[in-house]
Amino acid sequence: MNNRTIMAFDFGTRSIGAAIGQEITGTARALTSFKATDGIPNWGQIEKLLKEWQPDLVIVGLPLNMDGTEQFVTVQARKFANRLHGRFGVQVQLQDERLTTVEARAHLFDRGGYKALNKGKVDATSAVIILESWFEQRY
């Protein structure tokens, strides 16, 4: 098992959630979320986060339909992952993210009811779930 720092993004066309985790412990925590316009984030905010945490690997959630087929946002998520690699030179992997938003909403609702369900928290929590599922697949 490696001791890498891994960052995950929950890609969305209007908002992108971020989480950070350690491979050695297999744990992750929510960081923040960023507003996006048609899937395009403020790259300066992404750069600041990458410089602060210096991840060894970045995981980007890949939104698929329930039957595993791709949708329009799947293509945009792939572009986002490619741009992360191209702009910042980070190693990027894609991770199936089916139902992570549903799971994130349920988790947040259990902890704080409707007040906890703001979009930023949901997206950052979805990024945590994406990263934890990546850890689970490896160990």
UniProtKB/Swiss-Prot annotation:
Transmembrane segments: none annotated. One of its GO terms (molecular function) is nuclease activity. InterPro entries: RNaseH-like_sf, YqgF, YqgF/RNaseH-like_dom, YqgF/RNaseH-like_dom_sf. Disulfide bonds: none annotated. GO terms for biological process: rRNA 5'-end processing. Its main location: cytoplasm. Pfam families: RuvX. It comes from the Bacteria. CDD domains: YqgF (cd16964). It is found in: Cytoplasm. It is an enzyme of class 3 (hydrolase). Keywords: Cytoplasm, Hydrolase, Nuclease, Ribosome biogenesis. Its EC number is 3.1.-.-. One of its GO terms (cellular component) is cytosol. Belongs to the YqgF nuclease family. Could be a nuclease involved in processing of the 5'-end of pre-16S rRNA. This is Putative pre-16S rRNA nuclease. The lineage of its organism: Bacteria, Pseudomonadati, Pseudomonadota, Gammaproteobacteria, Enterobacterales. The gene is yqgF.
